[in-house]
Amino acid sequence: KKAFDRARNDATYGWDGSPITTARLSAELWAQIKDQDWSLVSDVAFVSRWPLRLWSFDQHYQFIGGAGGFGEGYGAPAAVGAALANRKYGRLSVNIQGDGDMMYAPGVFWTAAHHHIPLLTVMHNNRAYQQEVMHIQRMADRHNRGITRANIGTTLQNPNIDYSKLVQSMGVYGEGPISAVSY
């Protein structure tokens, strides 16, 4: 109980910031799914493990766990596969999808549409292969080279990718981007 209370308090830092924090993304998503029969079918490492800190996991199937395939485009195909398994139970499959990871295999959303695989995907779009950006920044700093060029070949901008249009072109409902929440 104390850990959940502390996590909920920690999640409030930067709550109204833009872009939306991964804590708020996770908290807002939890508020929408908590009364459903749901399964988190994505890893949590790239969203600072907020779902594990804020959500209540009380069924064995509610989290498929991490893959270890970081940076290799594992997320979206794994989510679609898990959603396929959940389909026969009528379970809501939830995927918090990183943008860089998705760009390895975006065609998997065509597969989901073609085979009528229900999946709620929320894109965490930081416009970068962020794990790689941070690694390059650490290495540049370690070798006293400065971090100003860490974005070369690691960012997904100019042009920015419109993920809602990308998935719409494959037959999937897409909406966004959402850069701020207002009620």
Question: Which positions does each model-derived feature cover?
Answer:
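Active-site diphosphate/adenylate-binding microenvironment
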Residues: 2-85
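Thiamine diphosphate
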Residues: 50-183
